[in-house]
Amino acid sequence: MVSDVSGYTGSLSHVTFKLYNTATHGIETFKPLREGQVSIYHCGMTVQSSPHLGHIRKEVVFDVLRRWLECSGYRVTVVANVTDIDDKILAKSAAAGTPWWAHAYHYENELHAAYKALGCRPPTYEPRATGHIPEMIELVKTLIEKGHAYPAPDGSGDVYFDVRSWPRYGELSGIRVDEMSPAEDSDPRGKRDPRDFALWKGHKEDEPETASWVSPWGRGRPGWHLECSAMSGKYLGEAFDIHGGGIDLRFPHHENELAQSAAAGRPFAHYWMHNAWVTMSGEKMSKSLGNTAQVSEVTKTYSPRAVRYFLLAPHYRSMIEFSPSDEGTMGSLDEATKAIERIDSFLDRASNLVGEQVTASHELSEAFVTAMDDDLGTPQAVAALFSQITEGNKSVSIGDAEATRHHLSQVKAMLAVFGLDPQAPEWADVAGSDDRLEPVVDGLVHAMLEQRAEARARKDWATADAIRDTLTNLGLTIEDTPAGAHWSLS
């Protein structure tokens, strides 16, 4: 099968993709439930405030996963939910004096703008929690019927999952029930055990009537953990391939999801995938700690492609330290900016030499494929990318158009997997870009280079140098090769 992501012809009979499974704490060979198809659910954002780099790292990681699986020949279905009803949304909207649904919708739009700004493609399905209340109520009813949930006896309308009724509780996180802290999601007085968590929350007098729905237990709203089990089941079925999110969701959120789904008789996810945090001064980037870097602010200083590179270049299970002072350490946004500049410089130089549109390669290098098949080994894959760029620059310098075309084709295929190809549709709407300008600028520069070549031919060195200086002052690098002069952005 040939994917439209990069053109790489991955044969499913030879795919050896390996993935770290959080549930088993080991690397496993990935085997999808349905041949040729992959189903992925990753937990979306609770739209209470602006998205920061910690949120958007997850979006980038799963976007790269999707691209690589498609590149390998799979048809991929991705579901990412939007939690648009939650305690924090109600509290923050009340403090701001805005309707809770308007508050949620505003920040949902900010989330969409953030992942679009960083070149992430939208999920196949992006369901809102509030649009799936009937499915959630049915799941709660099933759990009550099976003896794994109970309505609170205090008349609050709350319904809890009985953790003691499910012996496998704790299998994902490895935490024993007796070692767990009490669940903090509702009033403990209605619980059989402090660790029981809320499936359904009864309506409270100080909450808007519109933030509640009719249920067999009275008006109320779903608990956070319930939402994902119901929505993943609706769009992917009772069993699907990969469930993911940030590592902080492993417990209690994903543990609770797994327990309530399995207790209801659903096989649920076969692989669990978690990305590490973005940290600041060694601490997890978090709204509660007040140490966040909003995507909209960071992209005012750094190009969106540099920010995306910053988030994908380290391995997804490694922490990324964000330093607002950018002290020049490897992995900083300054280093990411230099990397993007090096990539773009090669693309410009190679395209100028080849003189025609070059498509992505249909066969990626072995080093790149091996790296990506090994649990999305982006650090090694990035190294393979820059190895191609180094060799490609050598070909440009000696004017070898055929070798340059080969390296350019490889680089474009790799950039497509990373979502970093500047000519890809997802970057077409980036602020300040206009594809119509590129041929105009290229034509003007080449006209000046032709005038310079004519001046050099008649030994008019003053004119030739003046043209070169003009182009250099405009931020261009001029390189004389046996095939003629070529330009690139400095």
Swiss-Prot record:
Keywords: Aminoacyl-tRNA synthetase, ATP-binding, Cytoplasm, Ligase, Metal-binding, Nucleotide-binding, Protein biosynthesis, Zinc
Residues bound to Zn(2+): C43, C228, H253, E257
Motif ('HIGH' region): 45-55
Feature: compositional bias, Basic and acidic residues: 186-204
Binding site for ATP: K287
One of the record's GO cellular component terms: cytosol
Main subcellular location: cytoplasm
One of the record's GO molecular function terms: ATP binding
CDD domains xrefs: CysRS_core
Motif ('KMSKS' region): 284-288
Region Disordered: start-end pairs: 177-204
Localization of this protein: Cytoplasm
Catalysed reactions, semicolon-separated: tRNA(Cys) + L-cysteine + ATP = L-cysteinyl-tRNA(Cys) + AMP + diphosphate
Enzyme class at the top of the EC tree: ligase
Co-factor binding comment: Binds 1 zinc ion per subunit.
InterPro entries according to UniProt: Cys-tRNA-ligase, Cys-tRNA-synt_Ia_DALR, Cys-tRNA/MSH_ligase, CysS_C, Rossmann-like_a/b/a_fold, tRNA-synt_1_cat_dom, tRNAsynth_Ia_anticodon-bd
Needed cofactors: Zn(2+)
GO biological process: cysteinyl-tRNA aminoacylation
EC annotation from Swiss-Prot or TrEMBL: 6.1.1.16
Superkingdom, taxonomy of origin: Bacteria
Matches recorded under PANTHER family: CYSTEINE--TRNA LIGASE, CYSTEINYL-TRNA SYNTHETASE
Subunit note: Monomer.
Family according to the record: Belongs to the class-I aminoacyl-tRNA synthetase family.
Protein name: Cysteine--tRNA ligase
Native source organism of the sequence: Cutibacterium acnes (strain DSM 16379 / KPA171202) (Propionibacterium acnes)
GN (gene name): cysS
